[in-house]
């Protein structure tokens, strides 16, 4: 027998075995004997979730709410639906029935609890009034849904108000991953309102705390212990403590206000179950609650406004493909024309604005904006354009930019069309704006008041930045929501009369051009720079402003996604001089500064719609 090589004699066996690759490789063990062979275990099935929906007079919201629900990334065969509706005066029941018939084969199970009669509660003052009998009925329905989830051995139950839009398709899995007994996704709204409280009084009422706003604005991110979550929240039924949670009947020790969300918060407290709200991501949106005297029209428009707010920074909500949405009929709101200015290369803005106007049933004429960046010096000279002598941007000391030149010409061309077509009153939109709630109705009401009073007007700002903030502007007598405009920036949206357009064209502004939002205050003699005003006469434009405003910018300086086509370009007559200051520090597009009490337009007559939407927490 040959001898082993020198140095290898007597090596231990174990280290040599450790150097060998595993027999089974990554797929498992391929043992010598059959009983030694194995395969890795399959993953766990997705948890069983019951989604509970309660609907009353919700027809306008259903296509969007159900469409968003359909987008949730949770296996439908592991999802059950529990749906109840009653006390309706619209076709909520019919829409829900149509949807459930279409989707029942896709989900694990469907429980349908409709009640066609009665259409109102005996002690309610209107469809938005929450009476004691309504609270009690809703609590009984929530308890019935909770019992159904327990009876079917569901792992979780998701309660979701029918006007809540869950736009993040991963919301369910994200909440489940938090491993909390009761957890809610923080929902966004147009105001400070959301679906959680940070403080509660000893009587169970809302209490303002310093912790709320940083969470609501996402200055602090995470999952936070709070005394109240409502509207949309998830309960982990696997947790032993969840067995002690109830919506109805109320706890024997309960003495607080008879309110479904407070009753459930008390139940959690007694069961020693902590509620949590998570704001790590944008999960969805909800409307600000309306007052008890509000109408179903108010509610429909409020929900539609939620859809508009979603589109400001997110893709539009996809409507359910299983139900037919009502056809919209657009009009011009009583104006002779509605213009919408858009740069051809800004397709995203154009699509968002056209969709926003369509949602509000507003018909518009699309106006292709003049792209100042594409104009060369010879084109500018051929049009006889000259900058106003001595003009300098008030913040950067620079001359006019090509972007501002294009913006001015875009508005100028509309004024020309107004005169050429003899349009008595027109509405002009830019494409980077967001609408306030009840926009269409409030503006139409205002214009009716203006006509009824026979007001002599040329231009009415619908959206602007007020620059004179030392004292209040003069309220217009007998006309609600209107003031005489002082020095203002921005041309986001305005109403212009034929007479107003004629005055602006008669000033021959192309030969002494300055930015359009500086030119307008010059023409109504409110610009603080006398040297600018000296080049124009007469300065008799009759200018007013809506108060409160109905239009605001989609983005301000410093916001994610903020882009300026006016200030971020080149100097009007020198393509080598760039003006890229605006991205970081433009003062012009900063949000309106807070007004002192003395400077607020507090004397303006208010309309009922101003107080319909409740901004309080």
From Swiss-Prot:
Gene3D superfamilies: Spore Coat Polysaccharide Biosynthesis Protein SpsA, Chain A (3.90.550.10)
One GO term (biological process): positive regulation of collagen fibril organization
Biased segments, Basic and acidic residues type: 582-601
Root EC class: transferase
Any Pfam family hit: Glyco_transf_25
Location in or out of the cell: Endoplasmic reticulum lumen
Reactions it catalyzes: (5R)-5-hydroxy-L-lysyl-[collagen] + UDP-alpha-D-galactose = (5R)-5-O-(beta-D-galactosyl)-5-hydroxy-L-lysyl-[collagen] + UDP + H(+)
EC number, UniProt record: 2.4.1.50
InterPro entries: Collagen_mod_GT25, Glyco_trans_25, Nucleotide-diphossugar_trans
Region described as Disordered: 582-617
Top-rank taxon: Eukaryota
Gene Ontology MF terms: procollagen galactosyltransferase activity
Glycosylation sites: 91, 179, 376
SUPFAM superfamilies: Nucleotide-diphospho-sugar transferases (SSF53448)
Entry GO terms, CC: endoplasmic reticulum lumen
Keywords: Endoplasmic reticulum, Glycoprotein, Glycosyltransferase, Signal, Transferase
Signal peptide location: 1-31
PTM text: N-glycosylated.
Motif Prevents secretion from ER: where in chain: 614-617
Function: Beta-galactosyltransferase that transfers beta-galactose to hydroxylysine residues of type I collagen. By acting on collagen glycosylation, facilitates the formation of collagen triple helix. Also involved in the biosynthesis of collagen type IV.
Family: Belongs to the glycosyltransferase 25 family.
Name this protein carries in UniProt: Procollagen galactosyltransferase 1
Species of provenance: Mus musculus
Originating gene: Colgalt1
């Amino acid at each position: 027998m040959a001898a082993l090589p020198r140095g290898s004699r007597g090596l231990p066996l174990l280290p040599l075995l450790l150097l060998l690759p595993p027999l089974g490789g990554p797929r498992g063990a391929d043992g010598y004997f059959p009983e030694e062979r194995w395969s890795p275990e399959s993953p766990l099935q997705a948890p069983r979730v019951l989604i509970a929906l309660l609907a009353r007079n919700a027809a306008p919201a259903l296509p969007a709410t159900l469409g968003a629900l359909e987008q949730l990334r949770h296996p439908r065969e592991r999802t059950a639906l529990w749906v109840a509706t009653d006390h309706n005066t619209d076709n909520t029941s019919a829409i829900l029935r149509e949807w459930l018939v279409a989707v029942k084969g896709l989900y694990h199970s469907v429980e349908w609890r409709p009640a066609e009669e009665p259409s109102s509660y005996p002690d309610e003052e209107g469809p938005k009034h929450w009476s004691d009998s309504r609270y009690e009925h809703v609590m009984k329905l929530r308890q019935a849904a909770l019992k159904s989830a327990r009876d079917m051995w569901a792992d979780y139950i998701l309660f979701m108000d029918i006007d809540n839009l869950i736009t993040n398709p991963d919301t369910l899995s994200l909440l489940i991953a938090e491993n909390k007994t009761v957890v809610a996704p923080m929902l966004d709204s147009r105001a400070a309102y959301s679906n959680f409280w940070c403080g509660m009084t000893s009587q169970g009422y809302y209490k303002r705390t310093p912790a709320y706003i940083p969470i609501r604005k996402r200055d602090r991110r995470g999952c936070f212990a709070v005394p109240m979550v409502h509207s949309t929240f998830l309960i982990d039924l696997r947790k032993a403590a969840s067995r002690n949670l109830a919506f109805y009947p109320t706890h024997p020790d309960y003495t607080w206000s008879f309110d479904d969300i407070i009753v459930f918060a008390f139940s959690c407290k007694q069961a020693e179950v902590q509620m949590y709200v998570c704001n790590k991501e944008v999960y969805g949106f909800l409307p600000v609650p309306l007052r008890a005297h509000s109408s179903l029209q108010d509610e429909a428009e409020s929900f539609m406004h939620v859809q508009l707010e979603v589109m400001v920074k997110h893709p539009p909500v996809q409507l359910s493909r299983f139900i037919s949405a009502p056809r919209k009929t657009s009009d011009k709101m009583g104006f002779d024309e509605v213009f919408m200015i858009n740069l051809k290369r800004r397709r995203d803005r154009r699509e968002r604005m056209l969709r926003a106007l369509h949602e509000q049933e507003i018909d518009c004429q699309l106006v292709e904006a003049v792209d100042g960046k594409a104009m060369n010096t010879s084109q500018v000279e051929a049009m006889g354009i000259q900058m106003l002598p001595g003009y300098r941007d008030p913040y950067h000391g620079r001359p006019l930019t090509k972007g501002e030149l294009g913006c001015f010409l875009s508005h100028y061309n509309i004024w020309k069309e107004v005169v050429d077509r003899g349009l008595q009153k027109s509405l002009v939109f830019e494409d980077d704006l967001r609408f306030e709630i009840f926009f269409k109705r409030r503006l139409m009401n205002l214009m009716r008041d203006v006509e009824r009073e026979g007001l002599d007007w040329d231009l009415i700002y619908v959206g602007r930045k007020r620059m004179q903030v030392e004292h209040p502007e003069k309220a217009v007598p007998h006309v609600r929501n209107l003031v005489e405009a002082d020095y203002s920036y921005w041309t986001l949206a305005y109403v212009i009369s034929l007479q107003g357009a004629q005055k602006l064209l008669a000033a021959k502004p192309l030969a002494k051009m300055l930015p359009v939002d500086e030119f307008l205050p010059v023409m109504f003699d409110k610009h603080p720079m006398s040297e600018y005003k000296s080049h124009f006469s007469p300065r008799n434009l009759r200018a007013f402003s809506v108060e409160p405003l109905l239009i605001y910018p989609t983005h301000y300086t410093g916001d994610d996604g903020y882009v300026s086509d006016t200030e971020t370009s080149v100097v009007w007559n020198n393509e080598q001089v760039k003006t890229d200051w605006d991205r970081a520090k433009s003062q012009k597009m900063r949000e309106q500064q807070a007004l002192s009490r003395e400077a607020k337009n507090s004397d303006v007559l208010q309309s009922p719609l101003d107080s319909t939407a409740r901004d309080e927490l």
